[in-house]
Amino acid sequence: MEKNNNFEMLGYVAWLWANSPLHRNWSLSLLAINVLPAIQYGQYTLLMRDGVPIAFCSWANLSLENEIKYLEDVSSLVYDDWNSGDRKWFIDWIAPFGHNYVLYKHMRKSFPYDLFRSIRVYKGSSEGKITEFHGGKVDKQLANKIFQQYHFELINELKNKSEVISIN
């Protein structure tokens, strides 16, 4: 995407952030951390209706190491982290005007064979929970097995990390 279009895209996303009860009070630095790499890598979807943005979704392809880094601090990802592996994470999901289901259907159709996870945060909460998403053509049982494998790998890596820390 051309640089001028990147600025236009950033404007659309900033407008959605300003209209989102969850995002509107977040800092400009969080907007930059969460949105600029997605735009630069083309790892986003923007839905428009009558020339007006109605929903936005961005994702990162993380390595296990960067997944752990992200889970420990959601604002820790740097540009190179966004394409460091094959573990897909939704970074932003914004539909402030009631188009959440439209975005959901669009993503299932656009990524029919992909698996994603996200950290879901509710307005007024400082904690999030991991949610899972699979494309429209992925067998649900297979998706569950793969997600279980992801969790197993994540837990083992966290255990190994804590053992290394406690030894030192």
Curated annotation (Swiss-Prot):
Enzyme class (EC, first level): transferase
InterPro entries per record: RTX_toxin-activating_protC_bac
Disrupted gene: phenotype observed: Mutants can express and secrete the LtxA leukotoxin, but LtxA lacks both leukotoxic and erythrolytic activities, and is unable to cause a change in intracellular calcium levels in host cells.
Compartments where found: Cytoplasm
Family: Belongs to the RTX toxin acyltransferase family.
Purpose of the protein: Required for full activity and modification of the LtxA leukotoxin. Involved in fatty acid modification of the protoxin at two internal lysine residues, thereby converting it to the active toxin.
Protein's recorded name: Leukotoxin-activating lysine-acyltransferase LtxC
Lineage: Bacteria, Pseudomonadati, Pseudomonadota, Gammaproteobacteria, Pasteurellales
